[in-house]
Amino acid sequence: LRWSTRREILQPMSVETTTFRNRVDQEAAPVRSWSAFQYGWNVGGAGAHWAGMSWRFSPWDFQVATQTRERYGAAKMKGLQLQDWGVTYDEMAPFYDRFERIAGTSGIAGNINGEIKPGGNPFEGARSREYPTPPLKDTHWMRTFREASDRSGYHPFTIPAGNISQAFVNPLGVTMGPCTYCGFCDFHGCGNFSKSSPQAC
């Protein structure tokens, strides 16, 4: 209860005020619930209690203004505050790859050097090689969903995870243990060193 229900691993809202507004003409009000913004209150911060989903931003994400303008025309951008990052996916790809090697990210690549691979995310940017560890095991309901999605013509794939599917020694020489599927990833540290957290990798 201490971690999963009372959220003692998260920063108390009384420590630092965060405000939010939806539009410029609104008065900013204090946030009363962290919701998706879960600040860690422990050694390792949010890196210790994250669930482990390990996505790369897509090429579109890095150049959202340019991509939107090219696809929909400049007129569609009126009133939008879109801006390119100033760095491209291709420039960031080697750093994503390095992180995935250090973290032991598990998954199936969907696009290796422009070649779409079955079982992976067909919409991801091109990567140079496979994930360092295989994807986590499917549960019964994941298999059921995958089969139904396949039959419907969709492209289901297992989310790349910072939860290690098999024993792994990363490039820094750190040994990480395989996930035991205990179910305590979110809002908990991993005592098995199976999650790509600061204390594990």
Residue ranges and their predicted role:
Residues L136-L172:
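Carboxylate/His-rich catalytic cores and anion/metal-binding grooves
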